[in-house]
Amino acid sequence: MSTSELATSYAALILADDGVDITADKLQSLIKAAKIEEVEPIWTTLFAKALEGKDVKDLLLNVGSGGGAAPLPEALLLRWRAADAAPAAEEKKEEEKEESDEDMGFGLFD
């Protein structure tokens, strides 16, 4: 987030906290009072239009977050459990194959 966006956001929060209507002029005057000079007027206009008619405190209190995951179907859980059990059996089979390859005499130094 740029300095312009941060300054305008903080100014909007200050105005909302005081219960003052958020307008571009009030945002700009608050930013100038804070001696922040690099904020272009477009930012204050955009923020004022975006927050027009909205309760900023209500927006902050109702910030949504990612909800919990949906419960998995039972069939999927059973498939995962079976998949977890299957690799153990496959590992034993692979070890037996490796031993049989060594007995065939394909080594370099035999």
UniProtKB/Swiss-Prot annotation:
GO biological process assignments: cytoplasmic translation; translational elongation
GO cellular component terms listed in the entry, alphabetical order: cytosolic large ribosomal subunit
Alphabetized InterPro entries for the sequence: P1/P2_N_sf, Ribosomal_P1/P2
One GO MF term: ribonucleoprotein complex binding
Keyword annotations of the record: Allergen, Phosphoprotein, Ribonucleoprotein, Ribosomal protein
Pfam families (UniProt xref): Ribosomal_60s (PF00428)
Oligomer and partners: P1 and P2 exist as dimers at the large ribosomal subunit.
Name the UniProt record assigns to this protein: Large ribosomal subunit protein P1
Lineage: Eukaryota, Fungi, Dikarya, Ascomycota, Pezizomycotina
Protein's gene: ALTA12
